[in-house]
Amino acid sequence: MNPSTALATVLVDTLVRLGLRHLVLSPGSRSAPLAYAAARAADEGRLTLHVRVDERSAGFLALGLARAGELVAVVTTSGTAVANLHPAVLEAHHAGVPLVVLSADRPHELRGSGASQTADAQARMFLPSVRYSADVPAPVDPDRQAPAWRSLLSRAVAFARGLRGDGPGPVHLNVGFADPLTPSPGDVPPGPGLTQVHGPGAPAPVALERGPRTLVLAGDAPDPATGAAARELAESAGWPLLAEPSSGARGGERAVGPYRLLLDAVDAEGPLGAVERVVLFGHPTLSRPVTRLLARDDVELVVVSAAGTWSDAGFRAARVVPAAQVQGPPGAGEQEFAARWDRAGKLAADAVDAALDAEAGLSGPWAAREVVAACAADGSTLVVAASNAIRDVDLTARPLGVRTVSNRGLAGIDGTTATAEGVALATGPTRLLLGDLAFLHDANALLPVPGEVRPDLTVVVVNDDGGGIFETLEHASAVDRATFERVVATPHGVDVAALCAAFGVAHSRPATRAEALAALTARPRGLRVVELVTARDRVRPRLERIAAAVRAAVA
């Protein structure tokens, strides 16, 4: 086989042997050797190949597949195609999600020469946001070079999985290919076996002393082990658990549902606010009450992180430990504190439900509660956009243990639908909850590609014609309404039904709660969009009523 075919074949074969199960491809000429090698492996049943036209959507599709625990690679041709992966790479970097990026390039001698579709810095494009980066020269002698290629991939995958370096994350291999780019027959170049890389092993837990009135706080954590550790600590210690929806810990007897309303409602000197210690897992970013809690001078902050980095945006961490456990029986003060939080959590959840049920129309918070309940009932996965939708889930949904994914690494709304498609293709029936701006931002993810499998994904669009989250922030009252609408809220007036029709996607627009419940509770089958039209000017008053109801319930 010719050198480019040999290189591509060795790369794909080695990735499969290292555990690759999904490869996402955006076609191009320079990357054709990788495309042919991937297609051949897919035909042999060794991997699942996903083809997408838009590289940005391809990147987030790969991210969604990777969030389901799979080893995933994404392949693009050279030039701006590679740059379109950058948002997904940044999210994978900040969230700690393993992802293998393979970008095709021209041979080294053509870089900097003005050759078409050649970026001088393509090999360094993602630095410093990748765990490992390598620039692979165009092959000259495949039989001699093949062992080096296999070794390089073993190293790259080890870094992607977090077996070396600062925890899991994306890696980038920029691969040179010279003509001919079309396949030719021949044997795979021989070489030694793969390098088996072992991680450092489970860290020894640090014992936390009994006595302080303690809350366990679980932020976003793509690794299920992080959420499981937070929940296990809270349950074994008997401490209240404040868990964000995408933490993997939001369930069990210690989980408190509308915790952020409780933090906002209570006095720091009162029985609920008298916190002495917070044990933090993951990356908490959803609410200002949590941020204020973590910034309190009178609260000891213990961060649990085995990676080389940890969350401490308030610069208050007293200790960072790789793992934590508690020994001995709780003190009387701990038990009383936990019991108060448990009672307050139940009262607050009932107050939220009553406030939502008192309304007759559709709303984001109501939809969030019902979508989570539907996922809990049929075991489907939930994907939530990183803006208002995830906050509505955090506010109104009961802690039912639903597997929830959200791109909270950098908290962008781009690529949300493609991420959900990846999750659904890897895990099965999935619901996606997002706003209209997040939906429109990733409309290309709906584009049908002949021969590609459509996921079992119900996309629930809460359409308030603009950025509803900004109604809850200071921007809504900082300037005149016309300026706010134009440069902050950005209403669009898009006909979502017409957009779905253009992409050949089923669409419904229920008008009542009964109609909406029927659509939301139907088990996801195929790709369909459920549009819930709501009023943006009611967002802030509704949240104020819910907060007032919680304050009254726990007073």
UniProtKB/Swiss-Prot annotation:
GO terms for biological process: menaquinone biosynthetic process. Catalyzes the thiamine diphosphate-dependent decarboxylation of 2-oxoglutarate and the subsequent addition of the resulting succinic semialdehyde-thiamine pyrophosphate anion to isochorismate to yield 2-succinyl-5-enolpyruvyl-6-hydroxy-3-cyclohexene-1-carboxylate (SEPHCHC). Disulfide bonds: none annotated. It is an enzyme of class 2 (transferase). The keyword Manganese applies. Its cofactor is Mg(2+); Mn(2+); thiamine diphosphate. Binds 1 thiamine pyrophosphate per subunit. Keywords: Magnesium, Manganese, Menaquinone biosynthesis, Metal-binding, Thiamine pyrophosphate, Transferase. It comes from Kineococcus radiotolerans (strain ATCC BAA-149 / DSM 14245 / SRS30216). Belongs to the TPP enzyme family. MenD subfamily. InterPro entries: MenaQ_synth_MenD (IPR004433), THDP-binding (IPR029061), Thiamin_PyroP_enz_TPP-bd_dom (IPR012001). One of its GO terms (molecular function) is thiamine pyrophosphate binding. Pathway: Quinol/quinone metabolism; 1,4-dihydroxy-2-naphthoate biosynthesis; 1,4-dihydroxy-2-naphthoate from chorismate: step 2/7; Quinol/quinone metabolism; menaquinone biosynthesis. Its EC number is 2.2.1.9. It catalyses: isochorismate + 2-oxoglutarate + H(+) = 5-enolpyruvoyl-6-hydroxy-2-succinyl-cyclohex-3-ene-1-carboxylate + CO2. This is 2-succinyl-5-enolpyruvyl-6-hydroxy-3-cyclohexene-1-carboxylate synthase. Homodimer. The keyword Metal-binding applies. Gene3D superfamilies: 3.40.50.970, TPP-binding domain. Coiled coil: none annotated.
